[in-house]
């Protein structure tokens, strides 16, 4: 039997998507830190 370790897109977006990050102050801090660092992708 196969394991369910594929990961679900909905869960991933809900927890670490761009809009999820924008929702909280700490999430916005994460985004600004990633911008400062020059990350190509800000969120998942």
UniProtKB/Swiss-Prot annotation:
UniProt region (Disordered), positions on chain: 1-44
Basic residues composition bias: residue spans: 1-14, 31-44
| Molecular functions per Gene Ontology | structural constituent of ribosome
- Give one GO biological process term: translation
Q: Which InterPro entries match?
A: Ribosomal_bL34, Ribosomal_bL34_CS
Keyword Metal-binding among UniProt keywords: no
Classification via PROSITE patterns? RIBOSOMAL_L34
- Give Gene Ontology CC terms: ribonucleoprotein complex; ribosome
Coiled coil: which residue ranges? none
Alphabetized UniProt keyword annotations: Ribonucleoprotein, Ribosomal protein
Top-level taxon of the source organism: Bacteria
Annotated family: Belongs to the bacterial ribosomal protein bL34 family.
- The name under which this protein is listed is Large ribosomal subunit protein bL34
The species this protein was found in: Gloeobacter violaceus (strain ATCC 29082 / PCC 7421)
- Gene encoding this polypeptide? rpmH
């Amino acid at each position: 039997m196969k394991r369910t370790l594929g990961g679900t897109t909905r869960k991933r977006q809900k927890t670490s998507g761009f809009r999820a990050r924008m929702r909280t102050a700490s999430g916005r801090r994460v985004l600004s830190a990633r911008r400062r660092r020059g990350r190509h992708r800000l969120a998942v």
